[in-house]
C-alpha cells in the first residue's frame, strides 16, 4: 500500500509491476525512512500467499524456505539504518520447521500456505487512518494465547480491563503525553493502551524475557508506531536499567509479583540513586517495592504512575514498611490505593491492588482508598473474575466506577474513603484496605 502510494505520480497502480532498478532503489530509500524496512515486489505478502496456493501441476507451491529468507531479509534491510535495533533478530523465535506445524515439510508448507491464503483475503483497512485492524488482531491473538498459557501468561500480558484503568488514571487531565514508560513491558499492550486514551509522542519499555521482548517490538510495529517513536530494551530493569537518563510523564507497569532480585546481595544497590534514600532495600525475595522505587525515580515532576502489585505491599512490615513510610511521610507521593478483585489475572488468583503515585500531588493531605474487590464490583466469567465494561452506558461499569471515584475524591459507603495522612500515621503506615474502607 505504501509503495503504491509512492507510485501514483508515476502512473503505476501496483508495486508488484515494478522491475526498474532505479524505481526500486527510490522506493527502498523512502521505505526505510517511513517504515524502517524494505521488501521487494516478489517478497510481498500477497505474492507469497498466491505462490503457496498455486496449482502444483504447473508450478511449485513450496514457500517455507522462501518465507524464512524473506523474514531474514527484513532484518538485513535495516542493517546500518536508524531502525536496526528495532528489527534486529525480531523473528528469532519463529521455527517454521517445528513439528507442531506438521510432521513433514509438505504438511508444514500446506498449513502455512492456507494461513497466508486466508489472511490475504482479509481487508485490514490499511488505508483507513482511524482503523487498526491489524494491530487489534495481533492484540487479540496475544490475549487468546495468554488465556491458555497458565502461570506464564502473567509474564507478558495484562488483562485489558486492568490496562484500561491504569491508562485512564495516568492520562487524567491530559490531552497529550510527551512519553510513556513501562519497566516490565511484556508484550507492550499496556503501553499501547495508554495511547488509546491520549496521543503519545514516545514509547519506552524494558523487558527481561527475550521472546516477550520480541512480542513487544512486533506489537509496536503492527500498531503502526514509527520506529523512531518507540524504544524497547531487553535487559533486567532492576539490575541494568536502560533509560535512567529519561523522565516520563506517565509510568505504568504490571511487574512480576513478588519476584526475586539481587537486593542486598549486590553491594551496588545500597548506593544506587533509585534506592539509597529509603534507607532499606526491598527484600531479596520480594522485588515489588524495588520496582516502585525504580518507577518513582523515572517519573517526571508533572507525571503520574500507576502500578499493579500484590496486596502484600500494603501491609508487609520490616524493610517494606520503611519504604512505604518514606513514600507517604517524606515524599507524600501515594495518591491512591485501589483494591482489585482476586482472580482477574492470568496465571494467579491472588488479590491485587493498584498504587497511584505522583511527585507533585494536588490533594497533599489525604490518600484515596477504593475497594473494588467485593462481589458487587465484578462478574464471574468461567474460572476468572472480570470487571464489567459494557458499551451500554446504562449498565454497570466497574472500570468507570473506579476511575470516577479516583477523580472525584468523594467518600462512597463501603467503596471509597478519603483517608487523611494523620490516620495513616496512626496505623503505622499500614495501608491494608479493611482498616479504611468499611
Question: PLM features: residue spans?
Answer:
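Non-catalytic, mostly N-terminal accessory regions of nucleic-acid modification and defense proteins
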Residues: 1-170, 228-237, 339-343, 365-373, ...
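A generic secondary-structure signal for well-formed alpha-helical elements
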Residues: 3-10, 145, 198, 224, ...
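Alpha-helix initiation/capping motif
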Residues: 105-108, 126-130, 155, 205, ...
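Membrane-interface junctions
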Residues: 140, 169-176, 298-301
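Conserved S-adenosyl-L-methionine
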Residues: 152-253, 258-269, 274-277, 289-290, ...
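A conserved structural/catalytic subdomain of Rossmann-like adenosyl-cofactor enzymes
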Residues: 241, 245-438
Amino acid at each position: 500500500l505504501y509503495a503504491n502510494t509512492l507510485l501514483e505520480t508515476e502512473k503505476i497502480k501496483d508495486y508488484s509491476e515494478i522491475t526498474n532498478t532505479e524505481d526500486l532503489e527510490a522506493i527502498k530509500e523512502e521505505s526505510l525512512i517511513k517504515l524502517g524496512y524494505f521488501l521487494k515486489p516478489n517478497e510481498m505478502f500477497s505474492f507469497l500467499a498466491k505462490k503457496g496456493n498455486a496449482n502444483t501441476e504447473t508450478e511449485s507451491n513450496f514457500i517455507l524456505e522462501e518465507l524464512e529468507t524473506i523474514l531474514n531479509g527484513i532484518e538485513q534491510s535495516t542493517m546500518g539504518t536508524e531502525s536496526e535495533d528495532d528489527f534486529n533478530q525480531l523473528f528469532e523465535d519463529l521455527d517454521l520447521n517445528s513439528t507442531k506445524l506438521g510432521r513433514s515439510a509438505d504438511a508444514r508448507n500446506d498449513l502455512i500456505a492456507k494461513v497466508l491464503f486466508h489472511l490475504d483475503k482479509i481487508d485490514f483497512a490499511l488505508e483507513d487512518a482511524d482503523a487498526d485492524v491489524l494491530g487489534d488482531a495481533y492484540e487479540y491473538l496475544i490475549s487468546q494465547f495468554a488465556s491458555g498459557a497458565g502461570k506464564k501468561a502473567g509474564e507478558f500480558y495484562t488483562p485489558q480491563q486492568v490496562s484500561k484503568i491504569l491508562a485512564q488514571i495516568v492520562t487524567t487531565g491530559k490531552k497529550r503525553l510527551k512519553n510513556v514508560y513501562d519497566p516490565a513491558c511484556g508484550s507492550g499492550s499496556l503501553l499501547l493502551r495508554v495511547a488509546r486514551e491520549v496521543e503519545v509522542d514516545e514509547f519506552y519499555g524494558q523487558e527481561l524475557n527475550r521472546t516477550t521482548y520480541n512480542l513487544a517490538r512486533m506489537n509496536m510495529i503492527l500498531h503502526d508506531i514509527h520506529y523512531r517513536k518507540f524504544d524497547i530494551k531487553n535487559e533486567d530493569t532492576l539490575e541494568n536499567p536502560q533509560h535512567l537518563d529519561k523522565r516520563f510523564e506517565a509510568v505504568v507497569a504490571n511487574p512480576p509479583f513478588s519476584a526475586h532480585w539481587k537486593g542486598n546481595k549486590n553491594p551496588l544497590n545500597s548506593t544506587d540513586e533509585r534506592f539509597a534514600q529509603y534507607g532499606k532495600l526491598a527484600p531479596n525475595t520480594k522485588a515489588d517495592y524495588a520496582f516502585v522505587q525504580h518507577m518513582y525515580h523515572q517519573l517526571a515532576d508533572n507525571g503520574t504512575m500507576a502500578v499493579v502489585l500484590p496486596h502484600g505491599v500494603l501491609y508487609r512490615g520490616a524493610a517494606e514498611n520503611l519504604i512505604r513510610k518514606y513514600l507517604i511521610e517524606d515524599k507524600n507521593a501515594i495518591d491512591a490505593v485501589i483494591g482489585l478483585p482476586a482472580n482477574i489475572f492470568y496465571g494467579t488468583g491472588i488479590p491485587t491492588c493498584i498504587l497511584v503515585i505522583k511527585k507533585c500531588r494536588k490533594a497533599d493531605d489525604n490518600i484515596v482508598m477504593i475497594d473494588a474487590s467485593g462481589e458487587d464490583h465484578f462478574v464471574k466469567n468461567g474460572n476468572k473474575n472480570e470487571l464489567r465494561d459494557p458499551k451500554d452506558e446504562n449498565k454497570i461499569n466497574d472500570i468507570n466506577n473506579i476511575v470516577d471515584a479516583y477523580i472525584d475524591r468523594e467518600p462512597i459507603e463501603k467503596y471509597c474513603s478519603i483517608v487523611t495522612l494523620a490516620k495513616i500515621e496512626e496505623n503505622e503506615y499500614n495501608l491494608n484496605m479493611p482498616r479504611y474502607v468499611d
